[in-house]
Regions:
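Active-site neighborhoods and metal-handling regions in enzymes and metal-associated proteins
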Residues: 1-384
Length: 384
């Protein structure tokens, strides 16, 4: 995991305590792109390992002007005397929970105190706009993460049987991911039976029993880029009739939701479409009545379908699992979105969630996980 994904996105540098300064209009060309790194020592090398040299940092980042962080205060003052506006970065991820004051916040406060007449602005909105659109190299890295995820999932399907523990399943994923130079993209969710109904179940310590479904929300990262996969499999190797009904219903919604990822559509519209699809499937499953489809509510969270499908249908993915992006902006070519419809039935100790990662293009959505088994027959065939 990189200390700062924004810094990595702009420079390729993933070393802690690094500073990037961009000043395109600086009079001195050497000050238009500058990278500041922590200077290493023999003691640091012994305790922490190798740190980048200046030439190595240039090779990684393409930035020629590399300095030690000890030089930063003096250089910053020189830049501030020339600059009028200063764009500063903070963690504005909508899912961020920051209870302790960060180094970024302390730096901003100090800078405002020393230079009160400068114009300070937020760089986060610009980075959100840039990062949500993936270039071909980024897409290739996500594809590779998906291929590692596929290997892990197929290994687990061959392993799972009644009596194994959820933690044993997690270990199988870990083995396959690490041997392929990947890592867990996020804390794995491996829930059998009733645990499948817990959206962010993380205990992963219960026995998988015959007749249970096993919900697997587990995926790999590679070179700091993430994938995000969910599959639901039968512990005994075959779905019951009811499990198969729910499974096929969710799969139909997944297929339709993938097809609905088109440039120009707003996330809220896409979400509403998914909820309508799930609601109609819930009628067929006996979870809702036809009259429930006609209920009009001013608060979307009060829709009858929310009892069975209560979360978002997907999100951008990239350097962050829930990647940056303005969700009130239209989808555009280059976005990579997860698609993750579900139906949760706690009364039956049954939940099905399915999730693939999809690239939005002008010529239609491209499912980056199209080769990962998802049809019920495919799952059962692998588990024989």
């Amino acid at each position: 995991m990189v200390p700062n994904t924004d810094l990595f996105y702009l420079s390729g540098i993933e070393q802690e305590e690094s500073i990037l300064v961009l000043f395109p209009s600086a009079e001195d060309e050497r000050m238009r792109e500058m990278l500041f790194l922590r200077e290493t020592s023999e003691l640091i090398a012994i305790w922490e390992g190798h740190k980048l040299t200046k030439p190595q940092a240039t090779e990684v980042s393409g930035i020629r002007s590399v300095h030690w962080t000890a030089d930063f205060p003096r250089t910053l003052h020189r830049l501030m005397c020339e600059a009028q506006s200063v764009w500063l970065n903070t963690n504005e991820h909508k899912r961020a929970v920051v209870e302790v004051e960060s180094r970024d916040v302390r730096f901003i406060r100090d800078l405002r105190s020393r230079y009160p007449l400068h114009d300070f602005r937020r760089v986060a909105p610009l980075l959100h706009t840039l990062r949500v659109v993936k270039d071909p190299l980024e897409v290739d890295l996500i594809r590779h993460a998906c291929s590692i995820t596929k290997a892990g999932f197929e290994r687990v399907c061959r392993f799972v049987e009644p009596g194994v523990n959820e933690c044993d399943v997690e270990a199988e994923f870990a083995h396959e991911f690490i041997r392929r130079r990947g890592a867990f993209a996020y804390n794995p969710i491996i829930g059998a039976g009733r645990n499948s109904c817990v959206l962010h179940y993380l205990d992963n310590d219960q026995v998988c029993r015959s007749g249970d479904v096993l919900l697997l929300d587990v995926a790999a990262s590679y070179a700091n880029y993430n994938s995000d996969l969910t599959r639901t499999i039968p512990v005994s190797g075959r779905f019951t009739r009811r499990q198969r009904q729910v499974y096929d219903a969710v799969l139909r919604v997944l297929r339709a939701s993938i097809a609905g990822l088109t440039p120009g559509k707003i996330w809220s519209q896409w979400q509403a479409e998914a909820e309508d699809l799930v609601a109609r499937e819930c009628v067929g499953l006996g979870l809702l009545k036809p009259k429930d489809l006609k209920v009009k509510v001013t608060d979307p969270s009060k829709k009858p379908v929310k009892k069975w499908f209560m979360h978002g249908n997907g999100h951008p993915i990239g350097l962050d699992v829930h990647d940056l992006g303005h969700m009130n902006q239209p989808f555009a070519t280059g976005w990579v979105m997860t698609v993750e419809p579900a139906i949760y039935i706690p009364e039956e100790d049954l939940a099905v969630r399915l999730e693939n990662d999809v690239l939005i293009t002008e010529n239609g959505p491209v499912d980056l996980m199209a080769d990962i088994p998802i049809e019920a027959e495919e799952i059962e065939a692998m588990m024989k």
